[in-house]
Amino acid sequence: KWEGVKASQYLEYEKSGSRDIMEIPNNRNSTAFGRLLMAELAEGKGRFLTDIMDGVFYFCEQTTWAESAHLVAFQKSKRSIPDYRTDVLELRQDGLAQMLSWTYYFLHDQLDKIDPIISMRLRHELQKRELDPFINRTDFWWMAWKESPTVFVNNWNPWCNANALLCYMLLENDRDKLAKAVYKSMVSVDRYLNYVKADGACEEGATYWGHAFGKLFDYLSELQMITGGKVSLFNNKLVKDMGEFVAKSYIGNGYAVNFADASAHVSNYMALVYRCGKALGSREMMDMAVDCFKERPEAVTSVWLDTYKQIEAMKVLKEMSQAKGDYKADAFTWYPQTEFCYMRNAEAFFAGKGGYNDESHNHNDIGSFVLYYNNTPIMIDAGVGTYTRQTFSSERYTIWTMQGNYHNIPMINGVPE
């Protein structure tokens, strides 16, 4: 059953600030579709084809694939209800476009046997919603098209570029148009690499690494493929340092350093960490991934709107299950530009943060720290609650989880930081 999203559910973002009211049914639809697609690709008997066809038709009939919170930012109307006149490139739109591009690539012949209009319509929507806006527009902030010393770039850049490039690789048969898209993505991602601090830390937090470096890794893998290996950055020191950040931020027992909006629990991307470790020649990353995988085998099964990651994960599952992980982290790690410091011994782990507020997903504090003993949290950062309209607005620092006095900074005579 494909769940419709009502106009009132989009508008609820403006009314109460809720994102979940439209995101939850949307995510249930895309999750179900992703499972149907993977099941059909695995079995290949056409058993799931009717449901896939219904899903394709449903998505094509949607006015937008974007989320209400992002429509406000990108639409000229600045409203959260979809405007049929505007195609928006944002995280969910690009992710769904990637999944539907795989659907067209693998299944358009089978869908044509039912009715050619299904795959014809899908190809039209992918061109209109993803390929054309990517190549024709430069006004999306995440592209960082107008480079300057103060340009802000975060995980959106590699995330959206990786999905867009993959869509072009799967759909575009004109070599000149494909080359133009490849070059444009390279210029944009180069701005992201210029923005990242020289120490390679992810200022957005360890679990956001999967969206930041994780998508950068996907992008660089795609770029290496489409250029026949002529463009490869896997021997670049900054890229390796960015990759190893996730391993150095791992505490143990499923916990990771959770500064900024990151979670305190390692995310479901251990196959990604393992693949990155192999590409970068990092034994530390591979061992960390294997140890986490054996502790929590489910850590590779759920990837939001990312068919590419799921396919690549399945290629290494057997290898990971047979590998012997022996993760040993450094006793001391210091990121001088990002101002993260990690110290550990046999029993204790301490992480301290300096930095400043004008960082992606940052909180309003003079600094923060977490302390673990025998992989058990003792002094914690409460993290972040459910994202709402307030989370990424001028009201952000009115939310208690974003304030220093609810981290571990004391109040002096009743005066907060």
Give the label of every model feature segment.
Residues K1-E14:
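Low-complexity, Ser/Thr/Pro/Gly-enriched N-terminal "stalk/linker" regions
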Residues N27-A42, D54-Y58, D94-Y105:
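Non-membrane alpha-helical segments in proteins
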Residues E40-M53, T103-Q127, Y168-M186, L223-V239, ...:
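Structural helix-adjacent loops and short alpha-helical linkers that scaffold large soluble proteins
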Residues Q62-F74:
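Short, flexible active-site-proximal loops enriched in glycine and acidic residues
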Residues R79-T207, D218, K309-E312, L317-D326:
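Active-site lining segments of carbohydrate-active enzymes
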Residues F213-M379:
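Carbohydrate-active enzyme catalytic cores, enriched for enzymes
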Residues G367-E417:
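Active-site rim segments in enzyme catalytic domains, especially the processed small/beta chain
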